[in-house]
Design a protein with these regions (language model features):
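Helix-loop-beta segment of a Rossmann-like dinucleotide-binding subdomain
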Residues: 103-106, 297-300, 323-333, 356-387, ...
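N-terminal Rossmann-like FAD-binding beta1-loop-alpha1 element of flavoenzymes
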Residues: 245-271
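Glycine-rich FAD pyrophosphate-binding loop
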Residues: 266-284
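Central helical "cap/lid" subdomain
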Residues: 280, 418-464, 493, 510, ...
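Dinucleotide-binding Rossmann-like beta1-alpha1 core, especially the glycine-rich loop
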Residues: 288-366, 766, 775
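A conserved short coil-to-beta-strand element within the FAD-binding core of flavoproteins
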Residues: 394-409
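Flavin-binding catalytic cores
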Residues: 488-519, 643, 722, 743-774, ...
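C-terminal catalytic lobe of FAD-dependent flavoproteins
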Residues: 514-518, 763-873
Length: 873
C-alpha cells in the first residue's frame, strides 16, 4: 500500500501531501500527555482494562506514551489506531532517535512493526499491552471494528488539511464504537468538529489548549449505539460478568497449546486435557512443516483472513519460540497452476510492494512468491514449547460439558472424572465433526499423509507447489501431503507416498539408492495398494530381489512395484519372464496377464483433478483369486485396458470370494468400471503367489517405436498413442560395470527437462517412513473460531430471517463461557494463533484482532444463519 512521504524539517517530520507537521515541534511528548493520555488519570481507578481508539496513528507518539504508562502496571491497555498512509519503519526509526525518553518502548514497537499491507495488524507488545494497527481509510476501518472504546484520540492532520477525517460521518461511526461515557480527546477546537460530535450524541466542552494553542475540545458520549445490521453475529455483552480465573483447554494440538499459552499469559490457571498419550500426536505431530499464508486474490475474504493469521503467527512464534521449534528462513509459493498465476498477477497490480512477499515471474520452474517471514516449522516441538509448564492431563477423553450456576463450566471425561473451570475452550481439530454433530456446522475430517525421505531436494527454505517440500531436518526430508476427506485410516499407504513424490516430481534431485524409484513426468503416479502398509515408523519394508517393495510382511510375494513401466526389456519380471508390452499396447491377450477393475472417475477427478488412465496387470488365475486369503485394496484406478479375454471368468470367480461383491463389476467389457473404489472390506482375495505391477499414470508408448537395444528410453523419439497411457522406466539401469546409474536434476528444472532426463535414468528416492494425521476442514474453508452459540435459540429467534433479515431482530444468545478454536487445514499453524487471539479478545472484551466482516466468516453459527436466510431449518 502507499506509505507516507516524510520530509524532515529541522528534525521534525513533515507531510508534503497534507502540508502539515506530524506533531508539535516545541514539546511533542508534553502535548501528547496533556491532550490525550491525561484521560487515563480520570478513569484509572475505575477500570482494570482500557480500550482506546485513535484516528491517525502518525508517528505513534500517543501510543508510545500510553505504552510507557501501562507497561509496568497491573492494568491492561488495548490500543486501536487507524492510519491510511503509514510511515515506513525506517522513517519511524529516524523519528524515535530524537526521543530517548521513549527508547524502551519505541524499540519494542519497531521490532514488531508490521509490513505495510492493508488490514488489521495485532501487535502484542507486553503481556498487558496490545496494539492493533489498522491500515486503511478511516471510514472503511471504523465499519470493520467491533468493541467498546473507553477513550478516543482524534489526532489526524488539521481539519482544514484533511476534512474527511473529521467529518460528521466519521464522528457518527466513532460514536457507534463508544461505551457510554467514553471520552473523545483532540487538540482541535474546530466549530465544524464540535457540531459533528454534538450531532453524533456527544456532550462537548472546550478546555484550555496546550502551549500556544488557546482551546481544545473534550467530549463524552451520552447517546445510544445503533445495533449492527447482522445482529446474529454480534458479540456477547460481558457486562456484570466476573473476570475468569481458570481455563480448561480440550485438545493438545497446536490450537490448544497456543490458546493455553495466551490464556496463561493473561494470568489464568490453565489446564490442557488431551485424549491421547501425549500432546501433538495427531495433525500437529509432523516432523516438519511450513509456516506460510494462503495467497488468494487481494479482495477475497479467505485470503485476507489467512494473511492476518499468518502475520500474527509469524510474530507470535518469533517472539515466544526458539530456533529449535521454528526457523524463519523464508518460504516460496510456486504458481504451478493457472489460477495461482492469476492471483499473482492481480497482486502485482494491487500491491506488489506489500512487504509480505516478493513476486517473481521469470523464475524456474514456475512464477513464485517468496514469503519473507515464511518459516520451517517443527509442529510437535512448537506444541511442547508453547505448553511447557502448563498442567496437562493425558489419556483424558472429553465426553461433554454442563454449565453451572454463576457461569462456570463442568467438563466430563470418559474415565468418569469431571473438571470445573471458568472458561472451556474446545480445540479438538479433526474431531470437531463429532463434537459438533448436534450443531448445524458443516465440518469434515481430512486425512493427510506426509512422506519422510532421505534428503533429496537441495533447499534451505521450504516451498510449496502442488505438494510441499521442507528442508532436511535430522537427516529426514518431509514432503506432502495427501488430502482425503472423511477417510479414517491410521496406517500409512504406499500409494500416498507415491502421490506425494509425484506431486513434487519437478523438484526432485540428487543421487539416491536404487531400490525405490519415482516417476518424474510431473503427472500422477497412483499405484496399487495391497492391504495395510504397516506402521511407517518401523522402516522395515521387505525388499524383494527385483527391486520392488513388499508392503505386508505377513503376505508372502504380494508386492507393489513403484514407478511405471517402459519397454518389455526392462519391465519388472514375473518369475523372470518379462511382460509383453507390445501386447499390452495393442490390447492383445498376453499370457497369464489379467486386468483389475476401476473406481469412479468422477470421484477421482474431484479428489485429484484430471488424471491420466492407470493400468494394473497381474499374474494369477481366477481360481487362485477366488480361493485366496489375502485382501487387496485397489484405489486410484481411472480407466483400464482389458488385456485378457478371460476377464469375465475372473470377475465371475472373484465374485465368489469372501468379502467381495460381484455386483461391483457393473460391466465386463474392454473398459470395466466400479461405482466406487474397492478397499480392504470389499476387496478381491488374491493368492499368495500373486504379484502385481502398476503401470502408473504416464503415457502408454507405441512399442513399435521402442529402441529394443537401449537400456533406457528417449521419449522424444516415441510416438504417443491415443489411449494416453504413459509408461516410464521402472527397473534398474546399470552402467557397464554393473553399478547403478544415478541422476542429477538440472539447475533449471522444468517438467519437460525432467521428463526427458528421467526417462534416461530416473532417480531413486529412499522412503524412510510416513506419518498420518487428521485435520479439520469446514464446508467454506474458514476455521471455526468463537463463542459457542445456543442452537435452539437461533433456530427459534431467527426462524423468519428469509423475511426479516433487514428488520430489527433480537440479540443472539450464546452458551456461557464455552469457546471453540480449530486450527484449520494445511495452514493450521497460522489459524491456531488467530484462534487463540480471538478467544482472548472475546473472553476479555477486547477489540477484535481481525476485521468484523472476517470475524463473521469464522462465527460458529454462520452455516445455520445461511440456511435460515433461505427459509430452511
Amino acid at each position: 500500500m502507499k506509505s507516507a512521504r516524510v520530509v524532515f524539517k529541522g528534525g521534525i517530520p513533515f507531510s508534503p501531501e497534507f502540508d502539515d507537521v506530524y506533531f508539535n515541534a516545541d514539546d511533542p511528548i508534553g502535548q501528547s500527555e496533556y491532550v490525550f493520555n491525561s484521560v487515563f488519570d480520570e478513569i484509572w481507578e475505575k477500570k482494570s482494562e482500557f480500550n482506546v481508539l485513535e484516528t491517525g496513528f502518525g508517528a505513534g507518539l500517543n501510543f508510545l506514551c500510553a505504552f510507557k504508562r501501562f507497561k509496568n502496571s497491573d492494568k491492561f491497555l488495548n490500543f486501536v489506531s487507524i492510519e491510511k498512509t503509514p510511515i515506513t519503519r525506517d522513517d519511524l526509526a529516524k523519528i524515535y532517535a530524537n526521543f530517548s525518553e521513549l527508547a524502551d518502548v519505541s524499540g519494542e514497537l519497531l521490532d514488531a512493526y508490521p509490513p505495510l499491507i492493508r488490514g488489521f495488524h495485532r501487535l502484542n507488545l507486553a503481556p498487558n499491552v496490545t496494539l492493533t494497527l489498522c491500515f486503511g481509510d478511516v471510514a472503511e476501518v471504523l465499519d470493520e471494528l467491533s468493541f467498546s472504546a473507553d477513550a478516543v484520540f482524534m489526532d489526524g492532520f488539521a481539519p482544514a488539511k484533511n476534512e474527511a477525517m473529521w467529518s460528521e460521518r466519521v464522528c457518527g461511526k466513532i460514536a457507534n464504537l463508544c461505551a457510554f461515557g467514553a471520552s473523545v480527546c483532540t487538540y482541535s477546537a474546530s466549530g465544524a468538529l464540535k457540531r459533528a460530535l454534538q450531532n453524533s450524541g456527544f456532550e462537548v466542552n472546550l478546555l484550555k489548549g496546550y502551549g500556544k494553542k488557546r482551546e481544545m475540545l473534550r467530549a463524552k458520549f451520552a447517546g445510544e449505539r445503533q445495533a449492527r445490521s447482522e445482529i446474529w453475529f454480534s458479540r456477547f455483552d460481558p457486562a456484570g460478568m466476573t473476570a475468569p480465573k481458570s481455563a480448561l483447554i480440550i485438545g493438545g494440538g497446536v490450537a490448544g497449546c497456543v490458546c493455553a499459552f495466551k490464556l496463561r499469559e493473561r494470568g489464568l490457571d490453565v489446564t490442557i486435557a488431551e485424549k491421547r498419550s501425549d500432546i501433538a500426536l495427531n495433525g500437529s505431530g509432523n516432523h516438519c512443516g511450513i509456516l506460510m499464508p494462503l495467497i488468494t486474490k487481494p479482495s477475497v475474504n479467505l485470503g485476507r483472513m489467512h494473511m492476518n493469521a499468518f502475520l500474527q503467527a509469524a510474530r507470535f512464534y518469533g517472539q515466544n519460540l526458539g530456533a529449535q521449534e521454528i526457523e524463519f528462513c523464508g518460504a516460496t509459493d510456486y504458481a504451478y497452476e493457472q489460477k495461482t498465476l492469476e492471483r499473482f498477477y492481480e497482486w502485482r497490480e494491487f500491491d506488489a510492494d506489500n512487504g509480505v512477499f516478493e513476486l517473481k515471474f521469470e523464475g524456474e520452474p514456475y512464477a513464485s512468491a517468496f514469503i519473507f517471514s515464511g518459516a520451517k516449522a517443527r509442529p510437535r516441538k512448537m506444541c511442547k514449547a508453547a505448553s511447557a509448564g502448563i498442567k496437562t492431563l493425558l489419556n483424558c477423553e472429553f465426553t461433554g460439558f454442563e454449565t453451572l450456576e454463576g457461569g462456570a463450566v463442568r467438563a466430563h471425561f470418559k474415565d468418569g472424572q469431571s473438571i470445573d473451570a471458568d472458561v472451556l475452550v474446545l480445540a479438538v481439530g479433526s474431531e470437531s465433526m463429532e463434537l459438533f454433530a448436534d450443531y448445524d456446522i458443516r465440518l469434515s475430517s481430512v486425512r493427510g499423509q506426509v512422506t519422510h525421505i532421505e534428503p533429496a531436494v537441495r533447499t534451505s527454505a521450504p516451498f510449496s507447489a502442488k505438494g510441499y517440500v521442507c528442508p532436511p531436518v535430522g537427516g529426514v526430508q518431509v514432503i506432502g501431503a495427501t488430502y482425503d476427506r472423511n477417510l479414517f485410516l491410521d496406517e500409512p499407504r504406499s500409494s500416498d507416498d507415491e502421490k506425494n513424490l509425484a506431486d513434487v516430481a519437478e523438484f526432485l534431485d540428487g543421487k539416491f539408492a536404487k531400490s525405490e524409484r519415482v516417476n518424474l513426468s510431473g503427472e500422477q503416479d497412483q499405484n496399487l495398494t495391497i492391504g495395510p502398509d504397516g506402521d511407517a515408523k518401523n522402516a522395515d519394508r521387505l525388499k524383494t530381489n527385483n527391486g520392488s517393495v513388499n508392503l505386508n510382511e505377513n503376505t508372502d510375494n504380494v508386492e507393489i512395484l513403484r514407478g511405471a513401466i517402459a519397454d518389455e526389456k526392462i519391465i519388472s519380471k514375473f518369475d523372470d519372464e518379462p511382460i509383453d508390452v507390445a501386447s499390452l499396447a495393442n490390447g492383445e491377450n498376453s499370457s497369464e496377464t489379467k486386468t483389475v477393475a476401476t473406481s469412479d472417475k468422477n470421484s477421482l477427478t474431484r479428489e485429484f483433478g484430471e488424471i491420466s488412465p492407470v493400468s494394473f496387470a497381474y499374474e494369477t488365475s481366477a481360481e487362485k483369486c477366488a480361493s485366496s486369503e489375502h485382501p487387496l485394496g485397489v484405489k486410484f484406478i481411472n480407466q483400464i485396458k482389458t488385456v485378457n479375454k478371460n476377464l469375465p471368468d475372473l470377475a465371475k470367480n472373484a465374485g465368489k470370494a469372501d468379502g467381495f461383491k460381484s455386483s461391483n463389476f457393473t460391466k465386463i467389457s474392454p473398459l470395466a468400471n466400479l461405482q466406487r473404489p474397492m478397499n480392504a472390506k470389499d476387496a478381491v482375495k488374491i493368492g499368495k503367489d500373486a504379484k502385481f505391477v502398476s503401470a502408473g499414470s504416464a503415457e502408454f508408448l507405441d512399442s513399435s517405436n521402442l529402441d529394443k537395444r537401449a537400456e533406457s528410453l528417449n521419449l522424444t523419439s516415441l510416438k504417443r498413442r491415443t489411449d494416453r497411457l504413459n509408461l516410464l522406466n521402472l527397473t534398474e539401469n546399470k552402467d557397464a560395470d554393473g553399478s547403478a546409474q544415478t541422476y542429477d536434476a538440472p539447475n533449471s528444472a522444468t517438467p519437460e527437462n525432467l521428463l526427458n532426463a528421467a526417462t534416461k535414468t530416473p532417480p531413486n528416492i529412499r522412503i524412510i517412513g510416513s506419518k498420518v494425521g487428521y485435520r479439520s476442514y469446514s464446508g467454506d474453508r474458514f476455521p471455526l473460531i468463537g463463542r459457542l452459540y445456543d442452537e435452539d435459540f437461533y433456530k427459534d429467534a431467527y426462524k423468519s430471517l428469509l423475511w426479516t433479515k433487514n428488520r430489527p431482530n433480537p440479540s443472539p444468545k450464546y452458551v456461557p463461557n464455552v469457546y471453540a478454536s480449530t486450527a484449520h487445514g494445511s495452514r493450521g499453524l497460522c489459524t491456531a494463533v488467530l484462534g487463540a487471539e480471538l478467544v482472548c479478545d472475546l473472553i476479555f472484551d477486547r477489540p477484535l484482532c481481525i476485521e468484523k466482516s472476517l470475524f463473521d466468516e469464522l462465527h460458529l453459527a454462520r452455516f445455520l444463519v445461511r440456511k435460515l436466510k433461505k427459509g430452511l431449518r
